[in-house]
């Protein structure tokens, strides 16, 4: 067997080793799996894209995250392609296209292979010329260095690509888990709300049945007494119409019966229908709209003292040394929040502990600051207040509020687009105090605070903006 035949058979064997058993083509970006078999990157990713799968060669299980680039096979493919290309071009590449002479020198300055005729020409005569073999060796070493750097970069890029693929998979799994958790939490919350609704309705039905039973009992008693009364009236009328002897017969007994008769009052306690209806999770849901409020010193009445963090305000004993600007309230101990709202949902809480008087709510940014005015929606105020032990809403006319548990903290919720301002008694499980609906805001809103006058000395406590508590 001739050397050329042996070389040909060796090349065929090498081509078989670098052929992908999936696509039957030379491997592109060869990747090794746990069992040691190697395949095209795209082919093996297609096999294992749905999770764990088995090797097409030996059926052993493998995972995509354990794939590793096979540089040995990649180099073999590149070398075999280069051999095939060199075999085809060897004749053309070894001789000068211009002179037909063998190329045996290399011009360093021009980076060009030369024959002996080219080397003697004026263009290359004064340039550095080295033998082809020597130049090839030098540049081969340089290319090897560059190749090694590029291969390491490619390996890093492939690893990063695989890491990103795994991150994408992990992220999607985490998102799906979080979605399931959110669905479960809201399903539970809806279930609790439905149960509480049923409990409240059942309690109301029970109160209704008991009240109607008592009314029925009283009606029966009243009918019985009415019948007895009618009989007594008829007896007395008969005696009056009769003879004197008949009139006097047992007259003392009849009069005693008539004098002792009385009609009981309808003393029935009606169910309390003004009591609050607790809604589970209301405070937590409201606090998802929480905004951090601070006080605007430029709007504060000159009697007010505002804390350093601008989260508390109280009535002072003397005027503060402040400028009388157009934003400042002049007649009442009022101050606005620094924040302005023209859209969205907002919620904050105010501590009114130990306060005997206060006003809270929101107002238009453009409200009157000087002189006397009333707090009403017509004047751009949506507020509730405590004054002389009475809670009221600033409607026209004012609305008396029946609050079962005196609040220590008030929650204020604004839905700008819906035109709603609601107040909640945080002390009483977040029960609703009052809601202004269908409000026409017509411009930016600001939080509103009135600490109330301290005539008796019992209203010195500050209004405090509460920190967020989830």
UniProtKB/Swiss-Prot annotation:
Coiled coil: 188-250
Enzyme category, top tier: transferase
GO MF, any single term: zinc ion binding
Any one of the GO CC terms: ribonucleoprotein complex
Short name of any one Pfam family annotated for the protein: zf-C3HC4
Keyword hit for Zinc-finger: yes
Pathway(s) per entry: Protein modification; protein ubiquitination
Function per UniProt: E3 ubiquitin-protein ligase whose activity is dependent on E2 enzymes, UBE2D1, UBE2D2, UBE2E1 and UBE2E2. Forms a ubiquitin ligase complex in cooperation with the E2 UBE2D2 that is used not only for the ubiquitination of USP4 and IKBKB but also for its self-ubiquitination. Component of cullin-RING-based SCF (SKP1-CUL1-F-box protein) E3 ubiquitin-protein ligase complexes such as SCF(SKP2)-like complexes. A TRIM21-containing SCF(SKP2)-like complex is shown to mediate ubiquitination of CDKN1B ('Thr-187' phosphorylated-form), thereby promoting its degradation by the proteasome.
Complexes and interactors: Homotrimer. Component of a SCF(SKP2)-like complex containing CUL1, SKP1, TRIM21 and SKP2. Interacts with CALR, CUL1, FBXW11, HSPA5, IKBKB, IRF3, SKP1 and VCP. Interacts with SKP2; the interaction with SKP2 does not depend on an intact F-box domain. Interacts (via N-terminus and C-terminus) with DCP2 (via N-terminus and C-terminus). Interacts (via C-terminus) with IRF8 (via C-terminus). Interacts with ULK1, BECN1 and with ATG8 family members, including GABARAP, GABARAPL1, GABARAPL2 and MAP1LC3C/LC3C. Interacts with TRIM21 and SQSTM1/sequestosome 1. Interacts with IRF3.
UniProt similarity note: Belongs to the TRIM/RBCC family.
Protein name in the entry: E3 ubiquitin-protein ligase TRIM21
